[in-house]
Amino acid sequence: MTANTKMMGRLIAVLFLSREIAHREHLRTKSYSQHVALNTFYDEVIEIADSITEAYQGRYGIIDDIPMLDAPPKAPIDKVLEDQLALVEKLRYSAVDKTETSIQNLIDEAVALFLSTLYKLRNLS
């Protein structure tokens, strides 16, 4: 099984940035359904990021660098989260081999949270 600590640090950084963006939009929105959906997202994504990091570090050692990422250009929150999801999906197999199912399953939880949040943002009012 192989892993790339730099890529895992970046994947975790994307989750951290997604939380920050969602929290800020949660405080700005005038839509109750968006407010609730984003609250759930920012509460849960940080727990998932923590679980991924701890499992990864249990297998491969400490991630020395989780970079601070710049915020993406201003866009509707569903588009921003969709783009952040695409980054997670792009990084996941560079960060840890697909055969490392315990860690990949935790990443699946993050992906599912993004998808559920996108559904709520786009379809519930």
Predicted regions and their residues:
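Short interaction-hotspot residues at assembly and binding interfaces
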Residues: 30, 67-68
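Generic structural signal for well-ordered, non-transmembrane alpha-helical segments
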Residues: 9, 13-16, 20, 39, ...
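Short, solvent-exposed segments of well-ordered alpha helices
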Residues: 2-13, 32-39, 71-78, 101, ...
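Helix-loop segments that flank and shape redox-cofactor active sites
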Residues: 17-40, 95-100
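Acidic/histidine-rich alpha-helical segments that form the ligand environment
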Residues: 68-122
